[in-house]
Amino acid sequence: MDHVKLVNDPIDIAHIHQLLADEGCGASSVFVGTTRDNFQGKKVVSLAYEAYDSMALKEMNKICSDLRSKWPDLKHIVIYHRLGTVPVCEASVVIAASSPHRSEALESVSFAIDQLKTRVPIWKKEIYEGDYDSEWKENKESIRPKKSQSAFNYAACPCKVEESHDVPRTLVQIRVNDAELTKRLECFVNRKRDEINSQNVIDFKSSFVNSDKDFSDSCARTQSTIIKQEQSNSHLKVRRVNNRCGPQQMEMRPNYELELNKLMGSRDGQTDPSKEMRKSLPNSRLQAIESYMCLTTDNEENIFSRIKKVENRLLQLESISPEYRHFTKLEPSSMEPPPPKKIRKKSYSAQELSAFIQKIKDGSEFT
Amino acid sequence: MNADGPVVNVHVLFFAKSRELANTPRSKVDLPTEITASDLLELLVSKFGLTPIRDNLILAHNESYIDNLSERILFKEGDELAIIPPLSGG
């Protein structure tokens, strides 16, 4: 039998037990919801309950029929809810069920209180001690409007949803309030930052042992490894990384020529130290270096600007070594193969040849 | 509102926070015989000053919740509408 009631007086638990009693039942389960005396540090004096009586009873009866369809073995069901002012620590709701075996009784009561909090139109207001304003409570389970009721009528704009829910894994829909969203974004940014930081450390400090690893995605220009040795605090081995994509590469690199000019305070081609010196210097040695470094040379150029060019090249090579040859695009090199030496080939006539042979013969005869 | 189509007189009940905002437990209102739930909600919210809780309200028509706001509601004379703020029973 179903016992559904809204009551204005204290609920008598003994009476509930009488309602549940049945000779064929081995289990009766009783849930008693009582009023707490505190909320967020505020002392609760009492609670005021109100209900949409007729609808509340209707919903409570619906819960009973739901329970019976889910657990057909249930014998008696009791749902009592108290209304009006309820002092703290008194029962505001009692849900009870009896059944031949315990599992139905226990599960159904648990299900019923969840349903009651979700569907039954009853409200409570907490009245606090002191100057705090009383507050209408809200069950987290409470039935709520499904859509956000903004001025825009979403319902009027049907949205076609693809049958297959193949949402890219990278996309996530999040429905939260602004504060929560801000918090999550902050967490995300912080985590990304940490990730990048740790990656940077890995970039710089990776083991030589795993040198077969591909570092082409690393932004680091150097790799280092700590090699522990006895009697030593630290041994850091550094090697350079061939990285064509790194921000320091190529275009982004400082203009060494300009920097060096600044350092030397020289204006290219304008300072012209002693011409004797230029002439006296054997240019061949410099030329050899220049050609080795793929520099176009001009013997008439100021010797200092030529040396400077070599220095620039050295700096550049240092910054990109050792594989510089693969990606330094330079002016066409002056390393064309030297013109072949013209060796005049002498041609002999038949008479000359026979005379020559005769000469050898005669000579052999003389000796 | 009442300009086009027939209208019916409907009872409106207020509870908890909505009762305090509307300053009355019950009222009567003239409504068209057919209206979408979202329009109905807008109408009631503006008529009874329920704006502070409009996003948390749910309506009950003749003691049944209106779950879907795009639903078309048909009214008869003397129907009962309830303004239901979030529940807190138990």
UniProtKB/Swiss-Prot annotation, chain A:
SUPFAM superfamilies linked to this entry: Molybdopterin synthase subunit MoaE (SSF54690)
Top EC category: transferase
Q: Which GO terms describe its cellular component?
A: ATAC complex; cytosol; molybdopterin synthase complex; polytene chromosome
Pathway-wise, it operates in: Cofactor biosynthesis; molybdopterin biosynthesis
Please name the Gene3D superfamilies in this protein's record: Molybdopterin biosynthesis MoaE subunit
Q: Where in the cell does this protein reside?
A: Cytoplasm
Chief location category: cytoplasm
Q: Which InterPro entries match?
A: MoaE_sf, MOCS2B_euk, Mopterin_biosynth_MoaE
Q: Which UniProt keywords apply?
A: Cytoplasm, Molybdenum cofactor biosynthesis, Transferase
Query: What domain of life does the native source organism fall in?
Result: Eukaryota
- Catalyzes what? 2 [molybdopterin-synthase sulfur-carrier protein]-C-terminal-Gly-aminoethanethioate + cyclic pyranopterin phosphate + H2O = molybdopterin + 2 [molybdopterin-synthase sulfur-carrier protein]-C-terminal Gly-Gly + 2 H(+)
Q: Which GO terms describe its biological process?
A: chromatin remodeling; Mo-molybdopterin cofactor biosynthetic process
Q: Where does substrate bind?
A: 101-102, 117, 124-126
Could you say which protein family the record assigns here? Belongs to the MoaE family. MOCS2B subfamily.
Q: What else is known?
A: This protein is produced by a bicistronic gene which also produces the small subunit (Mocs2A).
Q: What does this protein do?
A: Catalytic subunit of the molybdopterin synthase complex, a complex that catalyzes the conversion of precursor Z into molybdopterin. Acts by mediating the incorporation of 2 sulfur atoms from thiocarboxylated Mocs2A into precursor Z to generate a dithiolene group.
* PANTHER family the UniProt entry points to: MOLYBDOPTERIN SYNTHASE RELATED (PTHR23404)
Q: What is this protein called?
A: Molybdopterin synthase catalytic subunit
Swiss-Prot record, chain B:
Which one GO biological process term can you cite for this protein? Answer: Mo-molybdopterin cofactor biosynthetic process
Q: In which pathway does it act?
A: Cofactor biosynthesis; molybdopterin biosynthesis
**Pfam families cross-referenced by the UniProt entry:** ThiS
Superkingdom to which the source organism belongs: Eukaryota
- Grouped into one coarse class, the protein's main location is cytoplasm
Question: Where found, per UniProt?
Answer: Cytoplasm
Q: Which GO terms describe its cellular component?
A: cytosol; molybdopterin adenylyltransferase complex; molybdopterin synthase complex
For the modification 1-thioglycine, the affected residues are 90
In what way is this protein post-translationally modified? C-terminal thiocarboxylation occurs in 2 steps, it is first acyl-adenylated (-COAMP) via the hesA/moeB/thiF part of MOCS3, then thiocarboxylated (-COSH) via the rhodanese domain of MOCS3.
Assembly mode: Heterotetramer; composed of 2 small (Mocs2A) and 2 large (Mocs2B) subunits.
* Assigned protein family: Belongs to the MoaD family. MOCS2A subfamily.
Q: What does this protein do?
A: Acts as a sulfur carrier required for molybdopterin biosynthesis. Component of the molybdopterin synthase complex that catalyzes the conversion of precursor Z into molybdopterin by mediating the incorporation of 2 sulfur atoms into precursor Z to generate a dithiolene group. In the complex, serves as sulfur donor by being thiocarboxylated (-COSH) at its C-terminus by MOCS3. After interaction with Mocs2B, the sulfur is then transferred to precursor Z to form molybdopterin.
What's in the misc comment field? This protein is produced by a bicistronic gene which also produces the large subunit (Mocs2B).
Protein name per UniProt: Molybdopterin synthase sulfur carrier subunit
Q: Which gene encodes it?
A: Mocs2A
